[in-house]
Amino acid sequence: RKMLEQETFNQQMRIVCNGPKTEKYINLIDELQHKGLKVIPIIEGPTELKSFQYSRFDVGIRLDMPVKSKSSWNKPIDRFGFSRDELLKMTPFKNLRVLHYRIGSKYEKPSDILASTKYALNVFFKLKEKNHTLDTLDIGGGMPVPYERIRKYPVDKILEKIFELLKNESEKHGVSHPNLICEWGRFMVAPAQITIYKIIDTKKIVQKGVDAKKWYVIDGSFMNDLIDTWAIGQKWAVAPANNRFDDKLTEAWISGSSCDSDDIYTGVDGVVQLPDYDFDQNDPLHIVFFDTGAYQDALASHHCMLSSPLKIIAENGHIVVARKRESSEDVGKSFGW
């Protein structure tokens, strides 16, 4: 809303609203739709169905995809969406535009993408028999980022196969080719940022039975700056940042500046290959972590643009508000909006 008021928003963009929707959120969607914005709420469950099924504006609905993939965060039970049978039993919508689903994150096999797309297309064609406005398939996110600099399969080839599948299945059913939405945010924005640290101390590892020979201590914290390192064991490509590529290499572990023993990074194969360096204040070593633009310090506690909660202090029978819950304006300012 603020971006619209400031005339900094492209009104030709389509906004897809995923996730749970409070009454306040639903009212905002309605307000923006009445102002002419192309806002499409994705119906995630029965409560939202009551609010949007007969809307005169475009809506989408989520399929609870039974085709599973080998990927991160692939859950056997998904709390979002409706099964195929539930969708096909629904009375027709007034303006159903989008069928949405997702199968996981950072999926590993192209065949999983195609299998889920084919299943979703069959549901799409069945739904379209009663909902003639349906024209878009949203295959969600999950395209993996080659964090380790190993490109497992080219994205253009995957897209070619998806387009070929959409074309062939559509023509087989005598239906116009659907529009395609991909929510590959991580894949798009991760390469847009690198994170550089200065080595502020080194320490030899004298214990036997480990491959690493040195600790390198950085002037930052993985738990603050690259939180996926600690939270999900994310691996990164790491290199010296200040032209020390001719130096002899050593096997290192990298430690953050916090006092937490979990604030470490031990590399893809158990070590990080870095220039063999002993701390020298007059000859600093800087190292760079690549592809850090998705979900790290850029989002931190604002994943999915959620605001930080109200903070209160309860002491001796008194309750004091230490910090109010962040407003949408506060969150926007964090991103320079």
Language-model segments: residues:
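Active-site-proximal beta-alpha core segment in soluble small-molecule metabolic enzymes
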Residues: 1-136, 143-145, 165
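Short glycine/threonine-rich loop-to-helix capping motif typified by GTGT followed
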Residues: 109-115, 146-158, 189-201, 268-269
